[in-house]
Amino acid sequence: MSDLLSRTHAIALDAADPLRPLRNEFLIPRHGGGEQTYFVGNSLGLQPRGAQAAVQEVMKQWGELAVEGHFTGPTQWLSYHRLVSAQLARVVGALPSEVVAMNTLSVNLHLMMVSFYRPTAQRPVILMEAGAFPTDRHAVEAQIRFHGFDPAECLVEVQPDEANGTISLTAIERAIAEHGPRLALVLWPGVQYRTGQAFDLDAITRAARLQGARIGFDLAHSVGNLPLRLHDVAPDFAVWCHYKYLNSGPGAVAGAFVHERHHRDTTLPRFAGWWGHEEATRFQMAPQFTPAIGAEGWQLSNPPILGLAPLRASLDLFERAGMEALRSKSLALTGMLEALVRARLSGVLDIITPAEPQRRGCQLSLRVIGGRERGRALFEHLRGIGVLGDWREPDVIRISPTPLYNRYLDVHHFVEEVEAWAGL
């Protein structure tokens, strides 16, 4: 085995890692007498140490100011959601006016489709990937039915055409072109949740717009994982959650993007609520709705301040690190994991995530050779010894080395434990 795949080399890489201090900014779950080896940042990110202080700041302000906290104090709640806008915009490559933290992903997806899925008899079709995360498919079917159409006729799913269940860009572009005259909306993920495949958002956007279709992205597994350029790529909308790579806690407030070309479009339908009304006249309580300019205009209710506080703490860490530095470390971490699996576990694990670094984020999806029961046995064994990935039916273990807090030694430890389990 190459020295570059040795435990000694992993320790040396950790010692030289410029992002190493950021691990200390997180609470690492305990296991036995030590720390858990945690590879589930793609499902629920670890708690930033600053999250509790951020929440306590809000609690203190509530206790001391009560309702006046909306308008006074160091972080008045009237504009609290804007405290995250600039940092969040840098994470997703957008203008601050194009992003808003609000609701949850499924709610935001429905709100965006109210505005950007406008089917007609000639253009009723939504195109998405086969095997999409269930909430996306549920929402799409519900929207199609809401407009009086039949999902059996108006939902097109692009099937995998590559080994291991991934989808080529050629297949996506071909499907968009084939259904183009009937396409109302293309809804696509930035990263496919089960396979870990990352997609070329530029190319998909171009293909959709060439056919006159709207384009939106579910970036649940992309935000905080991959550098994004939403303003330049210019989809109509995007939605995502903040509890994965953005480390904002279970059920965290989610995020949405609306490109600036739509900000002053008064013909665009939307579901309205009072917090989406322009701030200057909101408290005049007029019956007419005047939307705020920007993504803020899609807000409904006043934001949950206690839910936004942990997001502030996490975004501060992203500011310290920078997305390019995080991506650089992520490539190295996941590259080491791939190399070790291929060198030492080729008879135990199959990697179903694309091998090309530009076609994946930090996640590797692994299928245990020997079938589902053997795979589940390995997953439970690893969990029992404090090495935590996650399981996705029917037979995939997802391992996601997250550069904010995972180490090269964590990757090496995972491979050693699988070797021991397999008796290698």
UniProtKB/Swiss-Prot annotation:
Pyridoxal 5'-phosphate binds at residues 105-106, 133-136, 218, 221, 243, 274, 302. This is Kynureninase. Catalyzes the cleavage of L-kynurenine (L-Kyn) and L-3-hydroxykynurenine (L-3OHKyn) into anthranilic acid (AA) and 3-hydroxyanthranilic acid (3-OHAA), respectively. Pfam families: KYNU_C. Its EC number is 3.7.1.3. It catalyses: L-kynurenine + H2O = anthranilate + L-alanine + H(+); 3-hydroxy-L-kynurenine + H2O = 3-hydroxyanthranilate + L-alanine + H(+). GO terms for molecular function: kynureninase activity; pyridoxal phosphate binding. Belongs to the kynureninase family. The modification N6-(pyridoxal phosphate)lysine is found at residue 244. Keywords: Hydrolase, Pyridine nucleotide biosynthesis, Pyridoxal phosphate. The lineage of its organism: Bacteria, Pseudomonadati, Pseudomonadota, Gammaproteobacteria, Lysobacterales. Homodimer.
